[in-house]
């Protein structure tokens, strides 16, 4: 339309994490005391962590449904596991979604809780960075159940924190861009509620060796594809295309006028 001749080319460059920044923030002096507080607060409990925007595509509903199924069909985890779910207010709030989440939290706590223990700790708010990194570091499992998502930075931050502290596994939805990035994570279909519950049970029961192997592979992927390597690879590709453009030889447009005159 603009009479510009182009040779378009597309590519896939996986966006990464600022690993050194996360590692630095996760090892600050204030993190240790927060971790100690969490361990004392949930002594003898396995901690599952979730941190999502309160948005339909983030799968918070599916996560809570799967946690209910876990406690229903795997009774060994009743009074032995806690889900700490942070839901960050979205830009456009949804009263209906907020109500659904609150109802599910109340259902789980009503059916499986007691006067001395509440299985779902739900915080609909932003939390301080120290609390956030302490939670990622002390958790026994991270749970990402998005039904559609791009690069989920929380999952990568969890991998970095766990490499420094616990080497605990992560469950991640196959419908996130991060699933391609973290091949060694335990991947699930968030719509398969029973399957997610089974994956949670498996993740809480895996051997120390499997925990170590999965975390090691995930950590290698995270540190090898950082935001810096993403920017570098993109710039290198642009430079390559520019060099190719200036060295290319274009075929001139065929001139029909001399041919027509000879007819």
PLM features: what roles do these ranges have?
Residues 87-130:
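Nucleotide-activated donor-binding/catalytic signature segment of Leloir-type glycosyltransferases, i.e.
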Residues 2-9, 23-48, 75-78:
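Nucleotide-sugar donor-binding and catalytic loop/hinge architecture
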Residues 42-57, 84:
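Conserved donor-binding/catalytic core segment of Leloir-type glycosyltransferases
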Residues 4-16, 87-89, 116, 207-263:
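C-terminal amphipathic helix plus adjacent low-complexity
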